[in-house]
Amino acid sequence: MTDEKQVSDSLNRQTAGNPYSAADPALSAEDNQHWLSFVALLQNAITQDLHLPLLQLMLTPDERTALGTRVRIIEELMRGELSQRELKSQLGAGIATITRGSNSLKTAPPQLKSWLEAQLLANKR
């Protein structure tokens, strides 16, 4: 079995019946397939404890920093104690980045919001 076929089969197994695996409307069909291939690769890397070196290979230091900042933005927005302007000052992020995070959070599925709350806020209150 070719590597491409293995990834395709893995994606099909992982996304079957999953309502969150639908095509990303922001991506072309081809780009969505590439995205899902990356997600499958990352999932496999996690099971083999290779996720950190994979992410270091795939993301520049600036991209890794940006992801960390986005996690902090979502965390603080969920906590709800700071205004977007205060977040901008505290995190050094642009107001547009914070607004995008806020808008994305508003449209996130309830199950994801609950999971994020448990992951990001449970031990930090």
From Swiss-Prot:
One Gene Ontology cellular component annotation held by this UniProt entry: cytoplasm
Keywords, sorted A to Z = Cytoplasm, DNA-binding, Repressor, Transcription, Transcription regulation
Q: Where is this region: Disordered?
A: 1-25
- Keyword Translocase listed? The answer is no
A GO molecular function assigned to this protein is: sequence-specific DNA binding
Q: One GO BP annotation here?
A: regulation of DNA-templated transcription
State where composition is biased (Polar residues): 8-18
Q: Which residues cross the membrane?
A: none
Principal localization reads cytoplasm
- What Pfam families does its record include? Trp_repressor
Q: What is this protein called?
A: Trp operon repressor
